[in-house]
């Protein structure tokens, strides 16, 4: 319970009563209260308490004020309180009922303000079942008395007693239901009351844990409790009459579940991994292991202590590490961590509750794996004091020597990787050392060409060190040194020209045979006494030759600055110098001839063609000059007209505009349209000057008002060249040949088509209403024809041959016809096909011949034919019903048919 110093003692009793009633109705204060947050602190202890044993921890709330609070116990002979609120036993003694309850006081050192809290200590339950309490031993909780009115003011009477919380150990073995307290109202003497409890654990989940006898008010627990699930139950007790009317205000009943040490500590990880650099000093932090206990952390059951059970390996000391028993921090306690000897340590860590009490505490273990990390405590060391190598001269990017070192540090780490450098013997920087990342070897490499004639041997001083500096306190030198002897091998080198290119200045127009200069190549291998010969490699204009022995260059043609092979007045030629070494080597040199201009080109008129009108007005011709020479052998130019022929100066006049341009105009008033060649004399400014008569083709044409030639004149004036005319004629001839070939091909195709039509089966020739009677159904049933009957019979007597008369095909025959009729007028071919073909040819040759020659015999259909006689087929109508006069218009071949159908009764 807490008391506020300087409380409102001067306030009216009514205000105090109202304020206290309001606070009790709300159940809690909204503002922070200085003091103990709990009304009662409880702990479960063994029967025997040892001296110095921590019992529990009480907390004090300062409300964020910097108060200096001093604790003291109401039983100082048995208990003391530390500054952090931990309660210790002053002496060893068996815990009795008298010592199970005491008070703890907290006093502000500055204001002397004082607070107190009750402490209840409970004995651990024995393994045997607790005996049932006698009825007279059951505690009672009586409802407080109601407020009474005195003199018009409310006044609360004192309670019979303060309702303390009920402490109930977890995991109780019963028997159940186990009686706790009896709830009673002092009005049960006059009324018949009924008691009940509400809240979590009674009528709210988890329901049925606490029950009350409605008549006697006996409150009981029905099952063992588990503090790790619910540490406190808050119930409300009610008292009503038999009609259900409330008799007493509900009272709060708090049931604290007293913690039992029923949970072992559990590590957050079964295996913990940490690391520490080798060579670390004692006290170096390594890692932290953490375990948790589900029991009450404010009681001994949840207070853990750590310790190291074992260390493997145990070298160089079995106790290389220690652990803070409260925080779990692992630190080093001994020197001598060396990764090259021991790379990893394995520790077995134990966590025990009850503050590490080995007798009562529960424990658990975990593994801590500590890796010793590498530091640079071993410098690289060369495996030899001197290394040897050789390199051909003028070679670069060649590995000369391979430097090897040893390093005991962890491979492929900055403490193991070697860095090489050349500390002496290479003032010009011709060598470099690269590090092989796999083997850590140093590769001595040539980075600049070496001349054998200048340096035949190098002695290099090299050093090797790690990428990171050595760790502090290491006695070894930070680097290792060695020497490298490099021998240079002589090789045949290329001859070279100096200078290259060689530039000379000469005037153009030099005659052939003129000696220009001498190209001389140098041989770097002066100790080999080799001969050099010269050849021409590139001479675009073929103007030069070179002496193969002494390198003299002579012209073989006239040098011309205006040649297309000369660029910017410079002519380039390339020559080759070769020695007779083994193997032979060669080098190239370039000769650049800067050609000086002379006045060797006469100027020409530009443009070479122009047009003007028939009259002097309204336009004129502007001309200029083209000279391939350069100043001072070019412009300014002089323009003039020649004296002959006389018509030139009579018809034309020229006026100089400036040094580069002149103007040509008609001198006469009218010049007939046409093309005129006007010679113009142009003179340059060379010394001596050079003149030229250049022809300007001028087209004189009719002009419009704007001074432009009309289209008619342009068309008339346009001329075709001979080549163009020949090409046009060739195209016309080829076109005519193609047309002729196409006509011949068409004629030939028509003849072939006509010949094929003569052989067309009459079945395909259907004209108007001409019917075909040679088709009698789905084909002949008898396919065994006697082809000999279709041939000319030789055994028939002449008097037996009876001519066949011409008759209508749609009329029944009047008399019986012979079975095998024979054409008497037919020749005697051996096959009926030949007979038909000959008849067709005769009809084609004689257009006036009647068509009966092509009549076929249809009355023989083979032996055994089931077809009836064709004469049995009657026409559906008489011949007079139809008009067949149009058959006369079909030509001679249908004349017979026209007579048969169009001749009436005849």
UniProtKB/Swiss-Prot annotation:
Residues in compartment: Cytoplasmic: 746-906
Phosphoserine modified-residue sites: 96
Predominant location category: membrane
Extracellular-facing ranges: 160-724
A biological process term (GO) from this entry: neuroligin clustering involved in postsynaptic membrane assembly
Amino acid composition bias (Low complexity), ranges on this chain: 863-880
Binding residues for Ca(2+) 3: 261, 263, 293, 301, 353
PTM per Swiss-Prot/TrEMBL: Cleaved by MMP24. Ectodomain cleavage leads to the generation of a soluble 90 kDa N-terminal soluble fragment and a 45 kDa membrane-bound C-terminal fragment 1 (CTF1), which is further cleaved by gamma-secretase into a 35 kDa. Cleavage in neural stem cells by MMP24 affects CDH2-mediated anchorage of neural stem cells to ependymocytes in the adult subependymal zone, leading to modulate neural stem cell quiescence. May be phosphorylated by OBSCN.
CC per GO annotation: adherens junction; apical part of cell; apical plasma membrane; apicolateral plasma membrane; basolateral plasma membrane; catenin complex; cell junction; cell surface
InterPro entries attached to this UniProt entry: Cadherin, Cadherin-like_dom, Cadherin-like_sf, Cadherin_CS, Cadherin_pro_dom, Cadherin_Y-type_LIR, Catenin-bd_sf
Keywords of this entry: Calcium, Cell adhesion, Cell junction, Cell membrane, Cleavage on pair of basic residues, Glycoprotein, Membrane, Metal-binding, Phosphoprotein, Repeat, Signal, Transmembrane, Transmembrane helix
Residues noted as binding Ca(2+) 1 in the record, renumbered to the chain: 170, 226, 228, 262
Pro-piece positions: 26-159
Single GO MF descriptor: protein-containing complex binding
Glycosylation sites: 190, 273, 325, 402, 572, 622, 651, 692
Location(s), subcellular: Cell membrane; Cell membrane, Sarcolemma; Cell junction; Cell surface
N-terminal signal peptide: 1-25
Residues at which Ca(2+) 2 binds: 170, 228, 259-260, 262, 295
Keyword Transmembrane helix among UniProt keywords: yes
Tissue specificity remark: In testis, expressed in Sertoli and germ cells.
Transmembrane segments: 725-745
Membrane topology of the entry: Single-pass type I membrane protein
Assembly and binders: Homodimer (via extracellular region). Can also form heterodimers with other cadherins (via extracellular region). Dimerization occurs in trans, i.e. with a cadherin chain from another cell. Interacts with PCDH8; this complex may also include TAOK2. The interaction with PCDH8 may lead to internalization through TAOK2/p38 MAPK pathway. Identified in a complex containing FGFR4, NCAM1, CDH2, PLCG1, FRS2, SRC, SHC1, GAP43 and CTTN. May interact with OBSCN (via protein kinase domain 2). Interacts with FBXO45.
Protein known as: Cadherin-2
Name of the coding gene: Cdh2
């Amino acid at each position: 319970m807490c008391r506020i110093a300087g409380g409102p003692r001067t306030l009216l009793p009514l205000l105090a009563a109202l304020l206290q009633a309001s606070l009790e109705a709300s159940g809690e204060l909204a503002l922070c209260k200085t003091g103990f947050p709990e009304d009662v602190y409880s702990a479960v202890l063994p029967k025997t308490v040892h001296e110095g044993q921590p019992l529990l921890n009480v907390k004090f709330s300062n409300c964020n004020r910097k108060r200096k609070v001093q604790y003291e116990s109401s039983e100082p002979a048995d208990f003391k309180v530390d500054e952090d609120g931990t309660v210790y036993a002053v002496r060893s003694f068996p815990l009795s009922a008298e010592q199970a309850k005491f008070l703890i006081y907290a006093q502000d050192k500055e204001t002397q303000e004082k607070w107190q809290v009750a402490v209840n200590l409970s004995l651990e339950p024995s393994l045997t079942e607790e005996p049932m309490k006698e009825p007279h031993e059951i505690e009672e909780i009586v409802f407080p008395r109601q407020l009474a009115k005195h003199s018009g003011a409310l006044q609360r009477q004192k309670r019979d007693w303060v309702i303390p919380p009920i402490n109930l150990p977890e995991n109780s073995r019963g028997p159940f239901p186990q009686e706790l307290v009896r709830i009673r109202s002092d009005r049960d003497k006059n009324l018949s009351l009924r008691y009940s409890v509400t809240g979590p654990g009674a009528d709210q989940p988890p329901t049925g844990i606490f029950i009350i006898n409605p008549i006697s008010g006996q409150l009981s627990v029905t099952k063992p409790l588990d503090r790790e699930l619910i540490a406190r139950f808050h119930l409300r007790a009610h008292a009503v009459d038999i009609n259900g009317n409330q008799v007493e205000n509900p009272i709060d009943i708090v049931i604290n579940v007293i913690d039992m040490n029923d949970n072992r500590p559990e590590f957050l990880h079964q295996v913990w991994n940490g690391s520490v650099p080798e060579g670390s000093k004692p006290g170096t932090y390594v890692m932290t292991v953490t375990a948790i206990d589900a029991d009450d952390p404010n009681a001994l059951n949840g207070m853990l202590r750590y310790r190291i059970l074992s260390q493997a390996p145990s070298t160089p000391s079995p106790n290389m590490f220690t652990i803070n028993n409260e925080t779990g921090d692992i630190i080093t306690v001994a020197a001598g961590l060396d990764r090259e000897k021991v790379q990893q340590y394995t520790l077995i860590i134990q966590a025990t509750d009850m503050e590490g009490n080995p007798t009562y505490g529960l424990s658990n273990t975990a593994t801590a794996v500590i890796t010793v990390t590498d530091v640079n405590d071993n410098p690289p060391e060369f495996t030899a004091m001197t290394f040897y190598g050789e390199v051909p001269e003028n070679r670069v990017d060649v590995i000369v020597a391979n430097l090897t070192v040893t390093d005991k540090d962890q491979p492929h780490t900055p403490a193991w990787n070697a860095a090489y450098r050349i500390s002496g013997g290479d003032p010009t920087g011709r060598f470099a050392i690269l590090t092989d990342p796999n083997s850590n070897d140093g590769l001595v490499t040539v980075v600049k060409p070496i001349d054998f004639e200048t340096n035949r041997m190098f002695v290099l001083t090299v050093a090797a060190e790690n990428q990171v500096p050595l760790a502090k306190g290491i006695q070894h030198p930070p680097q290792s040194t060695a020497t490298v002897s490099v021998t240079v091998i002589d090789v045949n080198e290329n001859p070279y020209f100096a200078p290259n290119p060689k530039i000379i200045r000469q005037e153009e127009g030099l005659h052939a045979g003129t000696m220009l200069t001498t190209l001389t190549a140098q041989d770097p291998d002066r100790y080999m006494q080799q001969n050099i010969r010269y050849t021409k490699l590139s001479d675009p204009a073929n103007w030069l030759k070179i002496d193969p022995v002494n390198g003299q260059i002579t012209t073989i043609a006239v040098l011309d600055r205006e040649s297309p092979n000369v660029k910017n007045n410079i002519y380039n030629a390339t020559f080759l110098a070769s020695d007779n070494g083994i193997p032979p080597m060669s080098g190239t040199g370039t000769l650049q001839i800067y050609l000086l201009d002379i006045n060797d080109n006469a100027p020409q008129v530009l443009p070479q063609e122009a047009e003007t009108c028939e009259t002097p007005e309204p336009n004129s011709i502007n001309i200029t000059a083209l000279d391939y020479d350069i100043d001072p052998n070019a412009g300014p130019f002089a323009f003039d007209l020649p004296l002959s022929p006389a018509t030139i100066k009579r018809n034309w006049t020229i006026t100089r505009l400036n040094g580069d341009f002149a103007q040509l105009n008609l001198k006469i008033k009218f010049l007939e349209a046409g093309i005129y060649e006007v010679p113009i004399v142009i003179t340059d400014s060379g010394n001596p000057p050079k003149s030229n008569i250049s022809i300007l083709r001028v087209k004189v044409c009719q002009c419009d008002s704007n001074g432009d030639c009309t289209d008619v004149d342009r068309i008339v004036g346009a001329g075709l060249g001979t080549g163009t005319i020949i090409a046009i004629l060739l195209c016309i001839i080829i076109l005519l040949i193609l047309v002729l070939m196409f006509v011949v091909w068409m004629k030939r195709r028509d003849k072939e088509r006509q010949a094929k039509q003569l052989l067309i089966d009459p079945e395909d020739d259907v004209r108007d209403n001409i019917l075909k009677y040679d088709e009698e159904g789905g084909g002949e049933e008898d396919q065994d024809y006697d082809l000999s009957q279709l041939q000319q019979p030789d055994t028939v007597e002449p008097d037996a041959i009876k001519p066949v008369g011409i008759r209508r095909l749609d009329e029944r025959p009047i008399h019986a016809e012979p079975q095998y009729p024979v054409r008497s007028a037919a020749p005697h071919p051996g096959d009926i096909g030949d007979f038909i073909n000959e008849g067709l040819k005769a009809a084609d040759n004689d257009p006036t011949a009647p068509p009966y020659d092509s009549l076929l015999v249809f009355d023989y259909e083979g032996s055994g034919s089931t077809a009836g006689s064709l004469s049995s087929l009657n026409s559906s109508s008489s011949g007079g019903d139809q008009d067949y006069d149009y058959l006369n218009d079909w030509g001679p071949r249908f004349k017979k048919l026209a007579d048969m159908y169009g001749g009436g009764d005849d």
